[in-house]
Regions:
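A short glycine-rich, Lys/Arg-flanked "PGG" loop and its adjoining helix->strand segment in the class I
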Residues: 135-146
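Conserved beta-strand signature within the Rossmann-like core of class I S-adenosyl-L-methionine
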Residues: 147-155
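N-terminal, positively charged/glycine-rich alpha-helical extensions of SAM-dependent methyltransferases
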Residues: 1-26
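Core SAM-dependent methyltransferase catalytic element
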Residues: 189-203
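A short acidic, Gly/Pro-enriched loop at the edge of an enzyme's catalytic core
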Residues: 111-121
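Class I SAM-dependent methyltransferase SAM/SAH-binding core
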Residues: 59-111
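Conserved SAM-binding loop and adjacent beta-strand
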Residues: 29-44
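A short SAM/SAH-binding and catalytic strip from SAM-dependent methyltransferases
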Residues: 119-133
Length: 203
């Protein structure tokens, strides 16, 4: 295990996040398990409060090695598709056989998903400093149909950058969405890091 990768992601030592996740893929699960990464299970449990049909198709945006899908499955969700920018992460997720479909995409192009295809989209530990920029928020949100749910998190490093929380406030204030859930809690316990978990419903 290379414990330095958690430091590198927050210090954004890689210009292209694909390079970071290429190098991190083999040790990613072990490093996050040893540091007690809790945001995925917090988000999955929160979703259960608002979803009655757990067989509803979910898009796990930025699925990585599948840690978020594992949390979702542990909470009873069963039909999950994943997309990510890292081939190396996708291959590890594929070996777990927990996704219906997996696809790697180019972050410099449009997200390869049809509008209204999924009524639930998750982006758990994805939109943050050192990973997907806040500019991707609207593109992901726009894929949802009316009444669709967007479950996502911002870690505390991202919460220190005003544009992250302001994006949520703007989306709600412009009556594009209603906020169903917002909770600050543990993100990576061994690093004493926190994250905010959100669930918003598209109007």
């Amino acid at each position: 295990m290379c414990a330095d990768f958690l430091d590198k992601v927050y210090k954004t030592e890689y210009k292209d996040p694909r390079d970071l996740y290429r190098d991190w893929a083999d040790t990613y699960d072990n490093e996050l398990a040893q540091n007690e990464y809790t945001t995925p299970i917090r988000t999955a449990k929160a979703l259960t409060k608002f979803v009655s049909n757990k067989s509803t198709s979910i898009l796990d945006f930025g699925c990585g090695t599948g840690l978020s899908a594992e949390a979702l499955i542990s909470c009873g969700f069963s039909n999950i598709d994943g997309i990510d920018i890292s081939n190396e992460m996708i291959e590890i997720a594929r070996e777990k056989r927990i996704y219906r479909n997996l696809e790697c995409f180019n972050p410099n192009k449009s997200i390869p998903v049809k509008k209204n295809e999924y009524s639930i989209i998750t982006a758990i530990g994805v939109i943050s400093v050192g990973a997907a920029p806040i500019s991707i928020f609207d593109e992901v949100f726009d894929l949802l149909p009316k009444d669709g749910l967007f479950a996502f998190s911002f870690n505390e490093h991202s919460l220190m950058v005003p544009e992250y929380s302001l994006k949520v406030e703007q989306t709600v204030n412009e009556k594009k969405a209603v906020q169903l859930f917002c909770e600050l809690g543990p993100h990576i316990l061994k690093r004493d890091l926190k994250s905010m978990v959100y669930i918003i419903k598209k109007l």
